Amino acid sequence: MPSVSIWGWLEQELTVDTSWWTQHSGGTVDEWDLCAHLESQYGPVLERRYAAWITPADVDTLATADVNTLRIPTTCAAWVDVPGSQLYHGNEVSFLSSIASYAINKYDMHVIVDIHSFPGGANGFPFGEARGHYGWFNNQTALEYSLKAVDAAISFIQSSDFIQSFTLEPINQPVDVEVSRSSEHLIVSQTGGASYSSNQSLGKWKPSMQKSRLCSS
């Protein structure tokens, strides 16, 4: 299954397009601080990015290389506006819909929608919300907003004309690996997440997901 992950489009990482990052970031290392640095301009800057970084012509190019699966990372903020978050909540879903519809209708591609970050931070990496953010674990409020994001992504897929052409990746690399604790033993939950803590959030994830519309027909 030839596939491509479309980094740096609906979620930003400093290593993907270094020229763009250098132009806009002010020396920051993650999207959270990028948005804070841009202040009132972060919306227009990111909207221009969404419109230009990936276009139907790029999908055409991928199709000529026999790519048949697109994995598209998004931030949690693409799906739900989280109070206190620096991440931008704008027209990400509209851009996702446009490219996904084109890829599916013209080339019968499969699209994996990836929710790449969660409120509070699920792994401490720059792409996990922000560098050093581990606050998702054992945080009921963060979990509730995460489930709202998952529910919104499911609604997006269910409202499409090609539900069978999508897969949802509801969480990316959840692990609270702080450098100061790197010599300790990890606890691995039944969902595959790893944690030094009690895994309460990870343990709740599976039954909570079962209550969501993932299980509806």
For each feature predicted by the language model, list its residue ranges.
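Active-site-proximal beta-strand/loop segments in catalytic clefts of secreted hydrolases
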Residues: 4-9, 73-76, 114-118, 169-174
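Active-site region of glycoside hydrolase catalytic domains
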Residues: 14, 121-217
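An active-site-proximal structural segment forming one wall of the substrate-binding cleft
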Residues: 41-70, 84-117, 127-168
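Short, low-complexity, polar/charged sequence segments that are solvent-exposed and flexible
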Residues: 21-25, 90-91, 130-132, 187-189
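N-terminal carbohydrate-binding accessory modules
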Residues: 1-67
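Short, solvent-exposed loop/turn segments at secondary-structure junctions
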Residues: 78-81
